[in-house]
Amino acid sequence: MPQLEASLELDFQSESYKDAYSRINAIVIEGEQEAFDNYNRLAEMLPDQRDELHKLAKMEQRHMKGFMACGKNLSVTPDMGFAQKFFERLHENFKAAAAEGKVVTCLLIQSLIIECFAIAAYNIYIPVADAFARKITEGVVRDEYLHRNFGEEWLKANFDASKAELEEANRQNLPLVWLMLNEVADDARELGMERESLVEDFMIAYGEALENIGFTTREIMRMSAYGLAAV
């Protein structure tokens, strides 16, 4: 596996590593902050699930603090301006969907796309992380599977009523993931993470989620093609 080989060669204190880390670390911090905000917003939209969603939000807040500690451990200041711009399009799409009461779209963005993005990135990062960050990230990724599962279960229970909106939300938002991956490909490589591995792991996680919700293999392939068009 390329990441495992790269871990033997990485210099966590080099200027090039720290420069790339300042953006990657900011992205994971901002991603957890976005998740905290999104789950709290979903709690307003799904009052019957309020307690569970608030619990998920608090978990994301703990993750954010953990990743902030990872940056401090390497004496790196995260580039939060870059990270906020990085998530801007998904953030605006979630915000617009929430304003229209589109719970299905909000769940696809947060519980499927963002969580699968995180699962892929964290799993690829763990083998090449410094010891401190590895321990933090291993704990975080276990939680992210639980968060994805929440969205899966709700959408599965409401699949027939949600299917058309899910397909449209996928069409609008999946291409953004590939643009985001392309934007950080060089920085990720500096940290020992290959873009191809990130793409593969994301597609596996996202495809599993769509299958669990109720989509057929043919439908998943068609939906995935919207992302590939942006590569």
Swiss-Prot record:
Its EC number is 4.1.99.5. Belongs to the aldehyde decarbonylase family. It comes from the Bacteria. NCBIfam families: Ald_deCOase. Fe cation 2 binds at residues 60, 115, 147. Fe cation 1 binds at residues 32, 60, 63. SUPFAM superfamilies: Ferritin-like. The keyword Cell membrane does not apply. Catalyzes the decarbonylation of fatty aldehydes to alkanes. Requires the presence of ferredoxin, ferredoxin reductase and NADPH for in vitro decarbonylase activity. Involved in the biosynthesis of alkanes, mainly heptadecane and pentadecane. The keyword Lyase applies. HAMAP family: Aldeh_decarbonylase (MF_00931). InterPro entries: Ald_deCOase (IPR022612), Ferritin-like (IPR012347), Ferritin-like_SF (IPR009078). It catalyses: a long-chain fatty aldehyde + 2 NADPH + O2 + H(+) = a long-chain alkane + formate + 2 NADP(+) + H2O. This is Aldehyde decarbonylase. Keywords: Iron, Lyase, Metal-binding, NADP. Binds 2 metal cations per subunit. The catalytic dinuclear metal-binding site could be either a di-iron or a manganese-iron cofactor. GO terms for molecular function: aldehyde oxygenase (deformylating) activity; transition metal ion binding.
